[in-house]
Structures are given as C-alpha cells and as structure tokens.
Amino acid sequence: MLPPALLRRSLLSYAWRGSGLRWKHASSLKVANEPILAFTQGSPERDALQKALNDLKDQTEAIPCVVGDEEVWTSDVRYQLSPFNHGHKVAKFCYADKALLNKAIEAAVLARKEWDLKPVADRAQIFLKAADMLSGPRRAEILAKTMVGQGKTVIQAEIDAAAELIDFFRFNAKFAVELEGEQPISVPPSTNHVVYRGLEGFVAAISPFNFTAIGGNLAGAPALMGNVVLWKPSDTAMLASYAVYRILREAGLPPNVIQFVPADGPTFGDTVTSSEHLCGINFTGSVPTFKHLWKQVAQNLDRFRTFPRLAGECGGKNFHFVHSSADVDSVVSGTLRSAFEYGGQKCSACSRLYVPQSLWPQIKGRLLEEHSRIKVGNPAEDFGTFFSAVIDAKAFARIKKWLEHARSSPSLSILAGGQCNESVGYFVEPCIIESKDPQEPIMKEEIFGPVLTVYVYPDEKYRETLQLVDSTTSYGLTGAVFAQDKTIVQEATRMLRNAAGNFYINDKSTGSVVGQQPFGGARASGERDIPGQPRLVQLWTEPPFTPLAVSPPLGDWRYSYMQ
C-alpha cells in the first residue's frame, strides 16, 4: 500500500501558473489479488482461525444501529441464528424504524459535502488500510464470523470474506485513482480539467446473506467515490457485516459516510424511495424485491432532486452444457463444486446440467460416486465438511418444497440425496435429479439450494439443446460449456451469447475473481452493475464537469465573418 503522501502525489495534480492551470495524469496504483490461504494443519492461519472460532462459541454479539455517529438501540430486537446450530444466537440486533432512517438520511446529506470534497487519494487510503486490516490482524475474526453466522466452510469464507473483500477494496481504490487521471484533450492555450464528484444525495445499499464481500462492496464502492450510504445488511449476515463496518470505521472512515441501519425490508424500501435525496440504490437480492424498488422509484420520480441510479444483481438459473467431446473429469469436478459448494447458495451456482446420451452413463456413475463422498456438517468443528446447512428456516422450507415436488413429479427422478433435517441446523443433503422434460419448472426457476437437475439429450440434437439452454429460463447470469472440439466451443459461444454475463469454457460457472473476471449478468439476473472492474466506480460518480477551462481573454463578441 502506498503511504498517503506518495498516493496523493500519484494522482492528478494541478497548480496555478500565471493565468493558466497546469496538470498531469495520474500514475497507476499497483495492486494484486489477495492470495488464498491453505489453512493446513499446524499453519498459523489455521491456529488463529481456530482461536477466533472458539471465542465465538455460545456467544451472542449485541449489534446496534449506527446513525449520526451514535449507537442506537431500538425496542425492535431480532436475532441471527447459526445455520448449522440454530440453538446458537450469534447476534442480537435491532431494527431502525422510519423515523430513525429519516434521521440517518439527514445525517448523510450533511456529511456528504465534506466527504465529497476530500481528495480521492485520502478516500482510497481508508479502503486500502481496511484491506490491510482484513489481510492481517482481522482476517481470522471476519472468517470466523462468516463461518458461524452464514454457515460457510473455511475455504468458502476465505474466498469471500478475506480474498474477495480485500480485492474489492484494493481494486476499487486503484480504479478510483486511475479514473482521476482520465482527462479531456487540452488544445493550447486552453487547458481543460475534469473532476469526478459523488452523486448529490445518498445511496441505499441493500446486501444479501451469501457473501460478506458483497455487503462491503455494495456500501464501500459508492462511499469511495464521494457518496454517503445507508447500508441495510441482511438479517442473516449481521455478525460479519457489522465487523466489516467496524473495520472501515477503524480504518478512518468518517462518521455518517456509511451508516449501519438494519431494518425491515419494506420499511427501508418505502423510506428511502420516498426521500427527495435518494440518488442511488445498490442492491443484491431477489428479482421481486428489485422490481418493487424500481416501481417505487418510478412512482416517486417527481419528488427526487436527481434521477436515482439503480444497480442490482438478482441471481440466476445457471447452466453447464456438456458436449460429447467434453472431458468427463472436468465436467464432474466442476459441476459438483459449482452446484454444491456453499449449498448452492451462490448466485452463480450451477443448477441445471445438460449431458449428451453418449456420456451420461459415465458422468452419472462418476457423479454418484463422488456425491457419496460429500460431507455435510458443522464447518466450525470439522474442517473436512464440504458444505454446511442452508441459511435459515425460510430457505430450508423452500428447498424442501422443491424436493417434495421432485418426488411427486412423473418427469423427475431423484438419483441421490435430498434428505432434509432441521432438528439441529437447516441441513439439506446435496440432491441430484434427472428430468425427462427440459421445460420442467425445476429447470426454470431459481432454487438457491443444493439441488442439481440433469437433462439428458440426444447427441445429434446439441444445437436444439443449446437453444433450450438459452430460452428455458428468464435469467442470464453465468454458464459454462464443456467441449474439447473447438468448433463446438465457437458455435456454443455464438448461440449462448446472451445467455450468461459470465461465460466459462471447460470450467465451472462459479469463481469469478476481482480484476480478472468482472461479475454480472443480464435479463432477470440484474442491471449488470459489474463489480470487479472500473465501470463500477464510474457508476457512482456524476458526469465529470469542467471547473476551469482557461482560454485567452475573449475580445470582440462578434465573429469575424460578421464584420
């Protein structure tokens, strides 16, 4: 990380020189992806994590709303339960009501003026420091809270709450620094200079349970660009989300730039969309919720001081398409990881698999063999666990209902798994289903659980099957094609051009890396906000304006041809 003084000097600098303005472009801020630690037996990182997990045993952390730089404790108290041990209340938190949310909006609007004027170098420095804290002394804490609170295994927590969140903070800082260096052409003797300012008003950040990193990014990216944010974290990710918020504050984030406001969803949505100061919504969640927010914004357009910007990612019904030329080992390993890691609770998880008849006996045998080795359990006590419980009782009931549908449908056959048990935690066995009907609802609708449905197609009808892949569902987030035949890969890439925002070849549909594979979809999967690339920080700036365009003094107001 660059020291503050050096970081400032790396940015666009300018100074008065007589009657003109002199400036130069920014240098690039060097960052790299955070290494993923192994957590092998006896390693320092494993020992530190084990201690952090032990510290959380049977503990309930009290979490306030943070509004106006004050911890506010309301009477509307809620609890976050550990998914794999719902007898453990990991967090006690309170909801903000409409009055408190309006107070937060007022505090945000007041804080914006000073925050937006702060040099981007100073703002970036805060997020770089937070990244260093997450990479070092606070790593074990954020991993343990993500594991216990959201049911992640050590590797899934490491990928999410450490590596990806650190990458978001560092790469966004890089993108912000470099954006300042993008300047218009200056033709002597004139000099043009642009400033990238934050949006006028406040941004509402609404984050999901399944990635600690997403919460930090939804709130952090707009704040980095000079905006003020009301952050509504997920009830089922409260423990880790509050830890991220505290780390940002300890890294130097000023009061009221991000305010931490757990709230009832409809209350939060109604309040922010009725405020004249709303300038943006940064969202990850369900399609119905995002559509509702869009409608609320549309209905209130006449009251806003500016047109709000809406960015949203809404999940997917992601596919793996297998051609007869595919490598079976890659298909099996990639599909098991994509479908069942974190219990299928990733927006990018594979939930529909298309397999040619010629390979189905081999792939089926391998899938069932490897499926029998998957261990589902308590990831805090057994690091051999591949995935844990689903997030809460609501998710458990939804997935169980789909499995009951699979048992009763004549076109569906359960090949493995699918047992459910909520006596201790919300456990669902990874389930593999074969469908005779490619248009069966289970092939169309997002389940968000450890359920993989397979459709076996005649080898010679691969083109028709590619059309099915493209047209079956309303989503368009991620997908993968497995084929060794380059001609088939090219053809599939053309035919599935609009079927996925992140399209993989001979690799699983999950696992995008910040700065390498910017993540986002289209269709019902969202507005394509594209975290992980420069466009994200640009989204949260006003169109640049020219504060100084220095030219020779204008003489006669008339043009020469008029004389």
UniProtKB/Swiss-Prot annotation:
It catalyses: L-glutamate 5-semialdehyde + NAD(+) + H2O = L-glutamate + NADH + 2 H(+). The record marks N210 as: Transition state stabilizer. SUPFAM superfamilies: ALDH-like. NAD(+) binds at S207, K232, G285, S286, V287, P288, T289, E446. It comes from the Eukaryota. Residues 1-23 form a transit peptide. Signal peptide: none annotated. The modification Phosphoserine is found at S43. Its EC number is 1.2.1.88. One of its GO terms (biological process) is proline catabolic process to glutamate. One of its GO terms (cellular component) is mitochondrial matrix. It is an enzyme of class 1 (oxidoreductase). Homodimer. PANTHER family: 1-PYRROLINE-5-CARBOXYLATE DEHYDROGENASE FAMILY MEMBER, DELTA-1-PYRROLINE-5-CARBOXYLATE DEHYDROGENASE, MITOCHONDRIAL. NCBIfam families: D1pyr5carbox1. This is Delta-1-pyrroline-5-carboxylate dehydrogenase, mitochondrial. It comes from Rattus norvegicus. The gene is Aldh4a1.
